[in-house]
Curated annotation (Swiss-Prot):
Subunit note: Heterooligomer composed of large and small subunits.
Enzyme Commission code: 3.1.11.6
Primary enzyme class: hydrolase
Source superkingdom: Bacteria
One Gene Ontology CC term in the entry: exodeoxyribonuclease VII complex
Encoding gene, per UniProt annotation: xseA
Family statement: Belongs to the XseA family.
Name of protein: Exodeoxyribonuclease 7 large subunit
GO biological process: DNA catabolic process
């Protein structure tokens, strides 16, 4: 018989652990030995912070993968925004979950793995966005010469906003609206993009005036400090802005992707203010110079016109010379008019004298006598004409009265009454037929209802089974042993209890 001493058993000196004990021991060992580590790797599976503010992703290289988590408090302290594929150095501690035997790193600090990694990522992003046309010079907008309102996207505290406001006040005082944002850290990019989009959505006639030009500004810093302005959402927001944008991020030697998307790049925030507004003193001097030039030009113009008018006046003849010929013509016309009036008056006098001789008193008296005779004849004919007219109208009225005899009306009334009596008889007959038809239909439906009801089935010797709730039992599978049932026959109900295994022979099979 073979010995089983080679198998671990109760007599072995190896300690025995439960699953939870060995998991807890591993957790303590890992956390004690790796309580503070620095891990270099590439960010994988990053989807941004969770709704809770925590971020879950993994660090990987070409041979392994390590799960990672950044709690909300540590996430807010990051100086840059993590991105998929970025190589970073994470500082934190390893921990395990005994319930699943998995381990991960809880990151307390994280930074890009050198400027080289960031520059490689920046160059890749630059090439990709340029291929989309976001840096196309044809999209650049001209800055307004004299804006009314300037929008500034920057930190509300610090020297940048003070320099911009001070420079604008010195050059050309106007209204400045500041949209406060964080200019460093994980939330820098989203906040700047939100500010640019927010300014673009302001209505022209709203309580907050829409800016005519935007300045996105930040002081100098390292590549990591300025990384938020390389964010893709910032570049897209600036490229899509309908308001001209001046980028003033970092010093003159610094550059970010927002510089390529903006309509104008300023070396410093102060330079951006100088680009945005002109110098008021220069405008006043230019206006004064142009006003003086205009006044001088107008003086020369009027002098030239005055000299031209004088030369023209000297070339013109005198008033007596101009009016001599018209005056002569007027005198000749007046002389001819006097003679013509005298001749015309003589002709009219001769004409009127001829008519006056025809209007003698005897002629007028004869005309009046003729008119009186005509009036008398008309007065004699008028009574006869009136009598004839009245006689004619009386005859017409008598004829119409004879036509309005009551006999036709009485005949029409009797005919209408007869028609109404016939309609009454037909109505009564139709109602009786309809009532009989409804009665017959009701009797047919009643017979059909009795035929289809289950009472007619009971009359033929069948029965209906109901359960304890009074519902019909349609299948045997719905009945369990010892169920209380009710069987309804033609003449009443009988209570029964279901029994398992009891089978009644089918009487039809023996026939």
């Amino acid at each position: 018989m073979a010995s089983d001493s080679s198998f671990p058993g109760a007599s072995s000196n190896v300690a025995e652990y439960s699953v939870s004990e060995i998991s807890g021991a591993l957790k303590r060992t890992v956390e004690d030995m790796f309580g503070h580590v620095r891990v270099r790797g590439e960010i994988s599976g990053y989807r941004g912070p969770h709704s809770s503010g925590h971020a879950y992703f993994a660090l990987k290289d070409d041979r392994a993968r390590l799960e990672a988590v950044i709690w909300r408090g540590s996430m807010s302290r990051l100086r840059f925004r993590p991105e998929e594929g970025m190589e970073v150095i994470a500082t934190g501690k390893l921990t395990t979950y005994p319930g699943s035997s998995k381990y991960q790193i809880v990151i307390e600090q994280m930074e890009p793995a050198g400027a080289g990694a960031l520059m490689a990522l920046l160059e890749e992003r630059k090439q990709r966005l340029a291929a989309e046309g976001l840096f196309d010079p044809a999209l650049k907008q001209l800055l307004p010469f004299m804006p009314r309102v300037i929008g500034v996207v920057t930190s509300p505290t610090g020297a940048v906003i003070r320099d911009i406001i001070h420079r604008i006040s010195d050059r050309y005082p106007l209204r400045v609206i500041v949209w406060p944002v964080r200019v460093q850290g994980d939330t820098c990019g989203p906040e700047v993009a939100t500010a640019v989009n927010g300014f673009n959505t302001l209505p022209d006639d709203g309580p907050i005036p829409r800016p005519d030009v935007l300045i996105v500004a930040r002081g100098g810093g390292s590549l990591e400090d300025l990384w938020g302005f390389n964010d893709e959402i910032v570049v897209r927001a600036v490229a899509a802005s309908h308001i001209p944008v001046i980028s003033a991020v970092g010093h003159e030697t610094d550059w970010t992707l927002i510089d390529l998307a903006a309509d104008m790049r300023a070396p410093t925030p102060t330079g951006a203010a100088e680009m945005a507004v002109p110098v008021k003193a220069d405008l006043q001097a230019s206006l004064a110079s142009q006003s003086a030039r205009l006044s001088s030009a107008m003086s020369r113009f009027f002098d030239q016109k005055r000299q031209a008018h004088r030369a023209a006046a000297r070339a013109m003849p005198s008033a007596d010379q101009l009016l001599a010929l018209p005056r002569r013509r007027f005198d000749e016309a007046a002389s001819r008019l006097t003679r013509a009036l005298f001749v015309n008056t003589q002709k009219k006098r001769v004409h009127f004298d001829g008519h006056a001789r025809q209007l003698s008193p005897r002629l007028l008296q004869r005309r009046l006598v003729e008119l009186e005779r005509g009036v008398t004849m008309l007065g004699q004919r008028l009574p006869r004409a009136l009598e004839a007219f009245l006689r004619e109208r009386r005859t017409a009225f008598t004829h119409r009265a004879n036509r309005l005899s009551p006999e036709p009306i009485l005949r029409r009334t009797r005919l209408t009454g007869s028609t109404l009596e016939q309609l009454d008889r037909r109505r009564d007959q139709a109602v009786r037929l309809l009532i009989e038809r409804v009665k017959r239909r009701s009797q047919e439906l009643d017979r059909l209802m009795r035929t289809l009801s289950y009472e007619s089935v009971l009359e033929r010797g069948f029965a209906v089974v109901f359960d304890a709730q009074g519902k019909p039992v349609k299948q045997a599978a719905a009945v369990s042993p010892d169920d209380a049932l009710s069987v309804r026959f033609r003449d009443g109900d009988v209570g029964v209890v279901a029994r398992a295994g009891l089978t009644i022979p089918d009487p039809t099979k023996g026939q």
